[in-house]
UniProtKB/Swiss-Prot annotation:
Organism: Saccharomyces cerevisiae (strain ATCC 204508 / S288c) (Baker's yeast)
Taxonomic placement: Eukaryota, Fungi, Dikarya, Ascomycota, Saccharomycotina
Protein name (database record): Uncharacterized protein YLR012C
Taxonomy, superkingdom: Eukaryota
Length: 99
């Protein structure tokens, strides 16, 4: 029997499900909602000591990783070594001083 995953389906996809599948999907969504509200309530009451710091460090590490790679991809071309060698070769030319 094939396992069906219902996570994040559109409303049109939901309408195409069989009635018993729609009930299973709604039950799954309700269970996920209850778990998330319990987690949020637990975090608001203090949660596990040090977990907020861990989450903050993970977010900062993710932000650093994303911004570093986006900066490097935007400003460092893949052919930079060849381009620099061409500049050096041009400066070594004897008639470069005339220009």
């Amino acid at each position: 029997m094939k396992t069906v995953y219902y996570k994040e389906i559109t409303y049109q996809q939901y309408l195409q499900l069989q009635p018993e599948q729609q009930e299973k999907y709604l039950a799954l969504c309700q269970k996920d909602f209850e778990q998330e509200t319990e987690r949020i309530a637990f975090d608001r009451q203090g949660g596990v000591p040090g977990i907020a710091r861990k989450f903050a460090q993970e977010e900062v590490a993710w932000f650093d990783r994303v911004t570093t790679w986006s900066y490097m991809n935007a400003y460092i071309p893949s052919y930079r070594r060849r381009r620099n060698l061409l500049k050096i070769d041009m400066l070594k030319m004897s008639n470069a001083e005339e220009y």
